[in-house]
Structure formats: structure tokens, C-alpha cells
Swiss-Prot record:
The record marks H139, Q353 as: Interaction with tRNA. CDD domains: MnmA_TRMU-like. Catalyzes the 2-thiolation of uridine at the wobble position (U34) of tRNA, leading to the formation of s(2)U34. HAMAP family: tRNA_thiouridyl_MnmA. This is tRNA-specific 2-thiouridylase MnmA. It comes from Ruegeria pomeroyi (strain ATCC 700808 / DSM 15171 / DSS-3) (Silicibacter pomeroyi). The lineage of its organism: Bacteria, Pseudomonadati, Pseudomonadota, Alphaproteobacteria, Rhodobacterales. Keywords: ATP-binding, Cytoplasm, Disulfide bond, Nucleotide-binding, RNA-binding, Transferase, tRNA processing, tRNA-binding. It is an enzyme of class 2 (transferase).
Length: 375
């Protein structure tokens, strides 16, 4: 029997798929599309947080209005929908680390941790408990079958590609996951499908901010989670001059130029380092932001050969989600640690961000790891 569109040798009606539904247009289209093809669809939405103000905030996933939108799609398309309370799991696995990372002078990426520790771990196990054959999401990334099993590839639409946020997907998870939107040419194509299915979310805005950070105000969330933890200190030039004072390192990120509160200087200055132990924000000229060597740990490797089977890998890497991949040499130190040498220096490389590995002249993702303070 030929394989169905999800890769199983049985009819869609006998193939159960759990769809992770955020209430946005992407996952809603995935659910409607699979239901339309005759699959046994089960929609699941996670209740991740409750910040009051965030509940009715459009453009943030998994708040109250989003649960309502997901449920409405399920009712209209005729498949079951469940809401799971993951608030405690989400706080322990994502929010606490987010706050502690900022206090340690890092710039975290909680969306990666959410995929790694919540959606592709606990939710995936729930999908197995529901006896689903696979789990589908609305992420813009592709799963392709290679000679050694499923591979992770960038989305067809480079502007929507979410590979940076999914580098920690393990081979075992990838075997179970499906990404039906990864091959689409644009977000417009997704919205057209939503309109064809008559979904009320067809024109719903994309999520912009971190879901549990209303209006993008990270500092207020951290102060609420860790009262009094943000300690004032000095703003210091890299040459040692004291230029001013600050209200806590949580208000600053590497590469920041605006809002430093140290006007009247002839040269533009940027945050080049956050010294938490001394409570110092270190600033300097732009050239001090250039970084060539990056220490990376907690590596998730998705190559066919073992990571340590070669002394070095010639790959492309991304050090921020908004940056294009740059050529690099990745030198394994262990199975989970490496030194990454950028062939062209990058500015504003920050501890807490991810360093994601890509095939040099192709679309395949080879995994990645976390940048840490060691340079």
C-alpha cells in the first residue's frame, strides 16, 4: 500500500495525528488541512501562563483568546480538542531559566526551550498516550527523508523559516513529528488556505513577542519573578572610565546602543560585556563587538556521522535568529561541546543565544548548541 501524506502505509482515516494548536493561523491551517484529508485529528492546546493582561492580548500564543480560537476551529472542522494545563511545567522549564539567565547577564531564547522542554517533550508524550501515530505543528520547517532516516531542513520560504528555534529537536522526536507548512512558498499561501477553509483566524496577526512577556517588557516580568534581584551598578567604558550608573544588568543586552543614558560623548558606544559579579555594564566602540571564536555547549547533533568522528566540521552557523548563516569551522571538544570559529567575525554575539549549524551549501540543519560565557 502506498504511503499517505504523513508517511504511513494506511488510510488517513486510520492514522491518528495530534495537532499542537496555539490558536494562531498556522496551526489552525494544519489541523483543518489534515482533517480535510480525512485524518483522525486530535487538537491539543497548552495553557502555559496566565498574566491577566496577556490573556486577551493578540499576537501572543497560548493565552485565553487563543484557546478560544483553537477550540472554535476544532468545533467548525469537527474534530476533538483538549486544553492541557501546563502552567507549572512551563514555569519550571522555561520562565524560571529565562529570569535567571537575564540576571546572569545572558540573553536567553525561551521559545527554543519551550519547544525542547515542553512541546516536543511533555506534549509529544501526551500525543503518544493518545495513541497518535504522529504529532503535527504549524512550524515553518521541513522534515525530509534521507538515506539514514528523517532530516531537518529549512522552510521553503526563507522569510518564515523557524529552524533557529528548532535546532534542539532530537532524531527520536523528528521521527514522530510532522511539519505540513514547511514546503509552502509564503505566509500568504497559509492565509489563503485559512480563507478557503473558512477559518475565523485567517486574518489573525502573527505572534510577535515572547508569549509570557506582555508588550515586550522583559525587565518588568523579571522583577516580578525575582523581586529585588536587579541590582544597580556602574556603566564603565572598556578603557576603565566610569561613565554613569544603571538600574540592573537585566535592562541591557550585548550590542545595545540606544537607551544607555550616557549622552554627551563624541563616539557612539555599544554594550560589549555584562559583568554581573561587578554589577558593571561595559561599553565601548563598535569594533569591540566583533567576535571570531564562540564556545558552544549543550550541543544537539543531527548529522549522520557522530559529532566527534571528525576534528572539525565545515558548516554555516547562525548566532541570532535574524542573522543570515555565516561560514564557520566547528571543532568538537566533546559530544556536547565545541569551539566555533567564524570565518567572518560577527558583532553582538551574546551568551544565552543559540548557535545553529547548517549545511554549507544546502538546506539541512545539523543541530546546534548554546553560546556561553567563555571568550
Amino acid at each position: 500500500m502506498p504511503l499517505n501524506s504523513l508517511g504511513f502505509a494506511k488510510p488517513p482515516s486510520e492514522t491518528r495525528v495530534v495537532v499542537a494548536m496555539s490558536g494562531g493561523v498556522d496551526s489552525s491551517v494544519v489541523a483543518a488541512y489534515l482533517a480535510d484529508q480525512g485524518y483522525d485529528v486530535v487538537g491539543v492546546t497548552l495553557q502555559l501562563y496566565d498574566h491577566g493582561a496577556a490573556l486577551a492580548k493578540k499576537g501572543a500564543c497560548c493565552a485565553g483568546i487563543d484557546i478560544h480560537d483553537a477550540r472554535r476551529v476544532a468545533e467548525e472542522r469537527g474534530f476533538p480538542h483538549y486544553v492541557l494545563d501546563y502552567e507549572n511545567i512551563f514555569k519550571d522549564a522555561v520562565i524560571d531559566e529565562f529570569a535567571d539567565s537575564y540576571l546572569a547577564g545572558a540573553t536567553p531564547v525561551p521559545c527554543i526551550r519551550c519547544n525542547e522542554r515542553v512541546k516536543f517533550k511533555d506534549l509529544l508524550e501526551t500525543a503518544r498516550d493518545l495513541e497518535a501515530d504522529c504529532m503535527a505543528t504549524g512550524h515553518y520547517i521541513q522534515r525530509k527523508m534521507g538515506p539514514n532516516g528523517p532530516e531537518l531542513h529549512c522552510a521553503e520560504d526563507a522569510n518564515r523559516d523557524q529552524s533557529y528555534f528548532l535546532f534542539s529537536t532530537t532524531p527520536e522526536q523528528l521521527d514522530y513529528l510532522r511539519f505540513p507548512l514547511g514546503h509552502l512558498p509564503s505566509k500568504d499561501a497559509t492565509r489563503e488556505m485559512a480563507a478557503q477553509y473558512g477559518l475565523a483566524v485567517a486574518d489573525k496577526p502573527d505572534s510577535q513577542d515572547i508569549c509570557f512577556v506582555p508588550n515586550g517588557n522583559y525587565a518588568s516580568v523579571i522583577e516580578k519573578l525575582r523581586p529585588g534581584a536587579a541590582e544597580p551598578g556602574e556603566i564603565v567604558h572598556a578603557d576603565g572610565r566610569v561613565l554613569g550608573s544603571h538600574e540592573g544588568v537585566i535592562h541591557y543586552t550585548i550590542g545595545q546602543r540606544r537607551g544607555l543614558g550616557i549622552g554627551g560623548l563624541s563616539e557612539p558606544l555599544y554594550v560589549v560585556r555584562l559583568d554581573v559579579d561587578r554589577k558593571q555594564v561595559v561599553v565601548g566602540p563598535k569594533e569591540l563587538l566583533a567576535t571570531r571564536t564562540i564556545p558552544v555547549r549543550e550541543i544537539n547533533w543531527l548529522g549522520d556521522a557522530p559529532f566527534t568522528s571528525r576534528p572539525e566540521w565545515h558548516l554555516s552557523v547562525k548566532v541570532r535568529s535574524t542573522r543570515p548563516p555565516r561560514e564557520a569551522i566547528v571543532r568538537p571538544i566533546s559530544e556536547t561541546e565545541a569551539e566555533v570559529e567564524l570565518l567572518t567575525p560577527e558583532e553582538g554575539v551574546s551568551p544565552g543565544q543559540a548557535c545553529v549549524f547548517y549545511e554549507s551549501d544546502g538546506s539541512r540543519i545539523f543541530g546546534g548548541g548554546w553560546i556561553w560565557r567563555g571568550y
